[in-house]
Amino acid sequence: MAGRGTGPDFVEALARGLDVLRCFEAERPTMTMTEIAAAADLARPTARRLLLTLEELGYVRVAKNSFSLTPRVLQLGMAYVSSLGLWQIARPHLETLVRQTGESSSMAQLDGSDIVYVARVAVPKIIALRVEIGTRFPALLTSQGKVLLAALSPGDLAVTLAEPSRAGLPPFLPRDPQAIHDELRTVRARGWALANEELAPGIRSIAVPVRDGEGTVRAAMNVTVHAAETDVETLTTQYLPHLLRTASDVSAEWALWQSRPHAEVTLSHPVAI
């Protein structure tokens, strides 16, 4: 991961420190210094200095020669979410949508060839996937990802699809490029996307775009269901109208928030803290 910078202002030490933080995943929440050095492609002395610096700053902790992240790293991700205003705006709308459908609902944005969850309201159901704010999945395997990819220009789409996933999942079988473009063209035309057990067996979802004040697609909102409980027809005939209405409300409120960047915006719903 290290050594990718070429510009005169690129700070390699900062990039390496971020590489160290990105090494920690759900599958490996605790790692030794040797494991971190290998995962981040760093010399062990370099990894040691970075880890000790991060420990002093409060971003990692060490116990029995193993390192793990601390809750302080949440400040980095939540600063981004808060700066968008998306979570504060979307949460009450997602809660209403969940009450209407009885199913979990989330919002995600594109980061490379992955989606990253930026808002979520879940119902207490056992599902095969653990999803929370910050979770990454390959965009092509998700309804939200398809919506976001469909909104890209041909050039941006080609660059995005060429990027490797950083979701930490096993490689998925490659698809025919023409089939991908055909599906995304359909998504773009009809305004919604479906993922039918592509990410995981038994998981089905439908997603629609969330737009900013200029009409640009900036996020995608979905409803996720158990495939054994809810068929595609129910998703498209019963849940999709609620989803489209909710996304429209969030888009309108987000556009208002963006138009008044230095003002206090009165939301249409109280925001729970």
PLM ranges: what are they?
Residues 66-164:
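Amphipathic alpha-helical effector-binding/dimerization core
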Residues 210-213:
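Sensor-regulatory modules in signal-transduction proteins
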Residues 190, 218-273:
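Juxtadomain coupling helices with adjacent low-complexity linkers
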Residues 1-88, 248-256, 271-273:
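N-terminal helix-turn-helix
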Residues 126-201, 266-273:
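Short, solvent-exposed recognition segments
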Residues 204-208:
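Short hydrophobic beta-strand micro-motif common in sensory/regulatory domains
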